[in-house]
Amino acid sequence: MARTVNCVYLKKEAEGLGFQLYPGDLGKRIFDNVSKEAWALWQSKQTMLINENKLNMMNVDDRKFLEEQMINFLFEGKDVEIEGYVPQKDDE
């Protein structure tokens, strides 16, 4: 049976992550409070941030920026702003 967490992002009970994906205290906080669904949403935003901002994960400043964005997105309810990105509209 999958473990559930009270997801701070989705604001509901949801399936939790299978294991701690991020190191340290922040990783523990994510494991305890973020669902698989919310983590998947973050991963798509993270990919967009890396690509659009040409972030280098070997660069400490770029990793710190990405971590700050992750905290804002998952725990503070702030959406990720990607300069120049316009979401595709559904044609109805």
Curated annotation (Swiss-Prot):
Entry keyword Iron: yes
Any one GO molecular function term: iron ion binding
Highest taxon, organism lineage: Bacteria
Single biological process term from Gene Ontology: cellular response to oxidative stress
GO cellular component terms, A-Z: cytosol
A Pfam entry, by short name: Iron_traffic
Keyword entries, A-Z: Iron
InterPro entries linked to this entry: Fe_traffick_prot_YggX, Fe_traffick_prot_YggX_sf
Role played: Could be a mediator in iron transactions between iron acquisition and iron-requiring processes, such as synthesis and/or repair of Fe-S clusters in biosynthetic enzymes.
Family statement drawn from the similarity comment of this UniProt entry: Belongs to the Fe(2+)-trafficking protein family.
Descriptive protein name: Probable Fe(2+)-trafficking protein
Lineage of source species: Bacteria, Pseudomonadati, Pseudomonadota, Gammaproteobacteria, Alteromonadales
